[in-house]
Amino acid sequence: MYTKYEQTAHYIRQFITERTPEFSIILGSGLSPLQDEVTPIMEIPYAGIPNFPQSTVEGHGNKLIYGTLSGKYVLLMSGRFHYYEGYPMDAVTFPIRIFHLLGIKKLIVSNASGGVNPNFSVGDIMLIRDHINLFPEHPLRGRNLEKFGTRFPDMSQAYDCQMIDLAETIAMEQGTPLQKGVYVGLQGPTFETPSEYGMVRAIGGDAVGMSTVPEVIVARHQGMRVFALSIISDLGGKDISPNVSHTEVLNAVNATMPKVLALVREFVKRSK
């Protein structure tokens, strides 16, 4: 498997014609407008990258964008891979391994998620401070690749506290209300039942979604700093029947997008 990682990294490296990116950024459902904030140097379609999967979900692109954002070099992933698409975990997290081999030290992850905290509203931005992994397969299951990290990585600070503090400071300056909470990862593809939403809340979750957790686990396994945010695209609970659709999720994300863009632009600019 490591040979495949090296082969893919070697292919992508030829397109990184200037400085090594400081950030890798993964765009979630409906968050494609963020790619318009990047001044592109090179676009790399997934279809041409050796060993790379393809995203099949509406609202997700299928390319890497190497360029600059707020004066920093970034490698942006327009379209992620989900466990519910039928991919094994090593495919879902394949790009994260490549980011590490390219020398990228920081990861920004975004998603749209369902809110279960009664204090949340549709359109809220939630900074992820921790997660609960309820995926049926662990991304580090199997033989450990020592070149990436230890067999038993620590996850007590999966999400970088300094990055969270910076985002909170910026949001306060911009007048953007933020939530902060625990993201629960489920495999999907069905949206949760009211009872499942209730379970998520009962075990300590504030929001629930179908991505992010595997990517973060692998990023931390190899020592990357991680910052993650969710847009609350719908609400659910044991006494709420949300009747949510993917179109409604995308609409909620679009309405919040200007605030997200402003936050991410300044975050990248000021991050150290």
Spans of model-derived segments:
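Short acidic/polar active-site loop segments enriched in Thr and Asp
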Residues: 105-106, 206, 225
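Generic non-transmembrane alpha-helical segments
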Residues: 11, 15-18, 162, 166-177, ...
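Non-catalytic positions within long, well-ordered alpha-helices that form the structural scaffold/packing
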Residues: 100-103, 201, 220
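Zn-dependent metallopeptidase/amidohydrolase metal-coordination segment
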Residues: 210-248
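His/Asp/Glu-rich mid-to-C-terminal helical/loop segments that flank catalytic regions of hydrolases
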Residues: 236-272
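Metabolite-binding pocket within alpha/beta catalytic cores that recognizes anionic/polar moieties
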Residues: 1-155
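Active-site/ligand-binding-proximal alpha/beta "capping" segment
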Residues: 164, 170-206, 264
